[in-house]
């Protein structure tokens, strides 16, 4: 950690010494409705990139210590037209009038599930411009990598294909993701498979990341974080964009976007087509990803209707297996022992011994691929019932279907419900074969919210939703060297998962005084989950589970001064186990629902060239389902309940306008993530059963105690930006034993990004972008897993997912 803090401070000192101080200004005024003259509390007033405030109960605001180079104030309020006021002509004490939007704004759709400075919760907003700077083909987890407390992972090692995300150490199954307020997480696994939505960032208008329990939302409740995405962006004028990028590992992205603008003063149509492809850093880990986005909107004076459809289709060569520790370290003796322990055949043994230490891929069959298509249909509506009340009603259908194909060497016929083959006097019980494991599902439902704004002290929302997931899981044998009595596409397992989810919530903000406001939020959520049939291990699965949860939240926000605020919140979240928690559990030990009590407290200050915030959190868990470090045969993590555990830490964020040319954004998380008393169960093949090992208090797996992100930008002219992006992630244990021999080592990476914006006569804008990732070629892994057993002694197998060394991406965006 010392080297990263020294490095970041050196950067700051280098650019800061001798730079001139800019003059400071104060701006104050009142925001009102242009027709009624009603003050607008909670309006946002921004001055430049880092400074901003919200109006108090009487619509008044004060901004102090604003640098002299801030040219305008920007005022926004949901349902109103944005106003920009030149600072050169601004008089303190002025009244700024906002006009109601002629059209119901798209932003009201996500307003009920988002938070703001009055909520008392930790959050980060990421706009379309910030995403566009980084978007050269890598997935959304990689684009969000420099937000606080976030760690991204990539199976293929280059940010394309299967990627993952953890926030505060919590994995993707606990991170609630919504698109336009509609749940996106897979209801059974609770995970998010970003590979199914390639280049979705090109259609996103904004992302809000809420850390902790967050506000009540739709779908499986957040149990560590929420990623709230909106695609509904209103374009008044027609537009077209073409983006192409190319880079290392034959990575390329091609995107075409277009929109009609406002037709007949009522209608808009927006569309996008994308292709993303890469050979991957890992051997054979290629991806071929295609997607589209199509949206049609009707904008009336009181009503808004938008139909969205988008789809992603992926063909990805599997790299789920990871690389054995001995291969990563180049330990030949260790590899030979691994080959012997795991019974690798000659082909697989030679692949292990002769592959590059960092690009090894266990799979060699030429069609060992994941093939999946996911189609989304959303009907998003909003109607203004009165000047104070808005009703939003949405409906959605998600259709998913696909399979992954695997070559199996010398597998038992009985594993596929096939009898032995008799040839003469010879009995054949094993065969080489190719199997496909299918998912075929529908996910559909509705969400709603009724939003009330008194334009005085009270703002409130009542909302909720229901949804149903109906998914078939089945496996087929499509080829076998000895086919027994099977027919083509012989089905060897089949089960169905039916999950229903309903929730109802109520939220309110109340402005007690000019300085003090409060937030309250209560939610009731009910879940039923039924699985029937046999799974891919030929185990009969027959369970019917129901859960009812009550999730209250409260928060306070107090304005200490014109420039600073303090806040605190307390939230309770509950969550049901996912599919694998049930199917991988023993009959004696069934998974239980988890409970999280989340305390957040923080401080925000903005003064002149500096913006700073500090957030403390204490996440106290009961029966937390923690990752054991083991994965199943498709790379999904296995979890187990632990009675008592917690995560506590402090998140620091800062932004500094060092001069007109230099800007620095940085964030750091320092945390402790502990299980009160962890017992490890090790399979004992020598004696049967398990050996129990009590480790006492341990660290939670995959939870680094230190995460640091930095973006240092140099802007020599208004059209050119050069940014150094730095990320430090501390040690992560692969399981919950705190064993130093089972961990991912800390790593520090540096990326360099260049952007040059041109405005030729034939185009609105031409953007030339270049990104050099890992410029110092840090040797590191971002993910891994482990498992152990006893067979002639204790054996522990560690696997890692190595990431690429220095690599680059170059792109050109044309806007018309």
Feature annotation, model-predicted:
Residues 141-183, 205:
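Extracytoplasmic beta-strand/coil segments of soluble accessory domains associated
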Residues 664-667, 672-674, 728-733, 756-816:
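C-terminal beta-signal and adjacent terminal beta-strands/loops
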Residues 388-396, 557-559, 565-571, 592-648, ...:
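Membrane-embedded beta-barrel scaffold of Gram-negative outer-membrane proteins
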Residues 96, 198-241, 253:
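A beta-strand signature from Gram-negative outer-membrane beta-barrel systems
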Residues 239, 246-277, 282-321, 326-330, ...:
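Transmembrane beta-barrel wall of Gram-negative outer-membrane proteins
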Residues 62-64, 183-211, 230, 327:
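Short acidic/polar hinge/loop motifs at secondary-structure boundaries
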Residues 32-36, 43-46, 74-80, 90-133, ...:
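Short, acidic, small-residue-rich periplasmic hinge/interaction motif at the N-terminus
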Residues 514, 618-620, 640-736:
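Gram-negative outer-membrane beta-barrel transporters
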């Amino acid at each position: 950690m010392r080297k990263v803090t020294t490095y970041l401070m050196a950067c700051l000192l280098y650019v800061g010494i001798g730079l001139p101080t800019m003059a400071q200004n104060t701006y104050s005024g009142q925001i009102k409705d242009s027709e009624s003259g009603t003050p607008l509390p909670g309006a946002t007033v921004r001055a430049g990139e880092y400074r901003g405030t919200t109006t108090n109960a009487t619509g008044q605001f004060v901004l102090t210590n604003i640098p002299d180079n801030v040219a305008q104030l920007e005022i926004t309020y949901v349902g109103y037209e944005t106003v920009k006021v030149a600072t050169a002509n601004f008089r303190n004490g002025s009244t700024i009038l906002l006009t109601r939007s002629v059209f119901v704004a798209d932003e009201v759709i996500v307003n009920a599930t988002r938070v703001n400075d009055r909520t008392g919760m930790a959050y980060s907003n990421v706009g379309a411009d910030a995403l566009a700077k980084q978007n050269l083909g890598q997935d959304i987890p990689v684009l969000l990598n420099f937000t606080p407390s976030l760690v991204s992972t990539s199976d293929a090692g280059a940010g394309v294909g299967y990627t993952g995300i953890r926030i505060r150490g919590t994995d993707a199954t606990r991170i609630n993701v919504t698109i336009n307020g509609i749940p996106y997480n897979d209801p059974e696994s609770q995970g998010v498979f970003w590979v199914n939505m390639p280049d979705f960032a090109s259609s996103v208008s904004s992302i809000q990341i809420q850390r902790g329990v967050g506000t009540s939302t739709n779908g499986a409740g957040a149990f560590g974080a929420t990623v709230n995405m909106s695609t509904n962006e209103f374009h008044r004028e027609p537009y077209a964009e073409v983006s192409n990028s190319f880079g290392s590992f034959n990575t390329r992205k091609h995107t075409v976007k277009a929109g009609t603008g406002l037709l007949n003063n009522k209608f808009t149509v927006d569309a996008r087509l994308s292709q993303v492809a890469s050979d991957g850093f890992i051997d054979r880990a290629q991806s071929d990803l295609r997607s589209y986005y199509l949206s049609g909107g009707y904008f009336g004076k009181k009503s808004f209707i938008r139909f969205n459809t988008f789809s992603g289709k992926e063909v990805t060569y599997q790299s789920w297996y990871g690389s054995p520790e001995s291969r990563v370290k180049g330990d030949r003796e260790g590899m030979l022992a691994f080959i012997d322990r795991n019974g690798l055949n000659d082909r697989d043994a030679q692949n292990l011994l002769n592959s590059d230490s960092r690009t090894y891929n266990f799979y060699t069959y030429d069609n060992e691929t994941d093939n999946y298509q996911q189609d989304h249909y959303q009907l998003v509506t909003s109607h203004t019932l009165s000047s104070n009340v808005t009703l939003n009603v949405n409906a959605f259908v998600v259709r998913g279907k696909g399979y992954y194909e695997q070559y199996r060497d010398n597998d038992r016929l009985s594993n596929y419900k096939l009898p032995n083959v008799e040839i003469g006097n010879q009995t054949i019980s094993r065969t080489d074969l190719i199997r496909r494991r299918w998912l075929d599902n529908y996910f559909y439902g509705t969400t709603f919210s009724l939003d009330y704004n008194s334009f005085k002290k009270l703002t409130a929302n009542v909302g909720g939703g229901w949804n149903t997931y109906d998914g078939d899981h089945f496996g087929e044998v499509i080829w076998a060297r000895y086919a027994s009595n099977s027919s083509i596409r012989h089905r060897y397992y089949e089960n169905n998962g039916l999950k229903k989810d309903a929730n109802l919530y109520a939220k309110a903000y109340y402005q007690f005084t000019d300085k003090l406001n409060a937030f309250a939020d209560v939610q009731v959520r009910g879940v039923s989950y039924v699985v029937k049939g046999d799974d891919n291990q030929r185990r009969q699965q027959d369970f019917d589970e129901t859960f009812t949860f009550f999730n209250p939240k409260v928060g306070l926000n107090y304005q200490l001064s014109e420039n600073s605020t303090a806040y605190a919140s307390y939230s309770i979240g509950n969550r049901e186990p996912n599919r694998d928690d049930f199917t991988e559990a023993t009959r004696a030990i069934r998974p239980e629902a988890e409970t999280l009590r989340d305390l957040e407290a923080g401080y925000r200050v903005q003064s002149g060239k500096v913006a700073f915030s500090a957030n403390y959190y204490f996440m106290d868990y009961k029966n937390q389902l923690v990752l054991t470090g083991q994965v199943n045969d498709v790379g999904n993590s296995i979890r187990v309940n632990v009675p008592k555990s917690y995560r506590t830490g402090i998140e620091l964020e800062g932004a500094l306008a060092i001069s007109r040319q230099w800007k620095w954004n940085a964030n750091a998380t320092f945390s402790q993530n502990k299980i009160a008393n962890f017992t490890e169960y090790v399979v004992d093949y020598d004696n049967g059963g398990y050996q129990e090992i009590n480790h006492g208090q341990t660290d939670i797996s995959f939870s680094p105690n230190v995460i640091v992100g930095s973006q240092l930008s140099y802007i020599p002219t208004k059209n050119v930006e050069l940014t150094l992006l730095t990320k430090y992630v501390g040690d992560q244990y692969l399981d919950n034993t705190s064993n130093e021999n089972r961990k991912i080592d800390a790593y520090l990476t540096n990326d360099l990004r260049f952007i040059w914006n041109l405005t030729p006569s034939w185009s609105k804008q031409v953007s030339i972008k270049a990104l050099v990732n890992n410029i110092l070629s840090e040797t590191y892994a971002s993910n891994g897993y482990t498992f152990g057993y006893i067979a002639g002694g204790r054996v522990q197998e560690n696997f890692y997912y190595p990431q690429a060394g220095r690599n680059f991406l170059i792109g050109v965006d044309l806007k018309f």
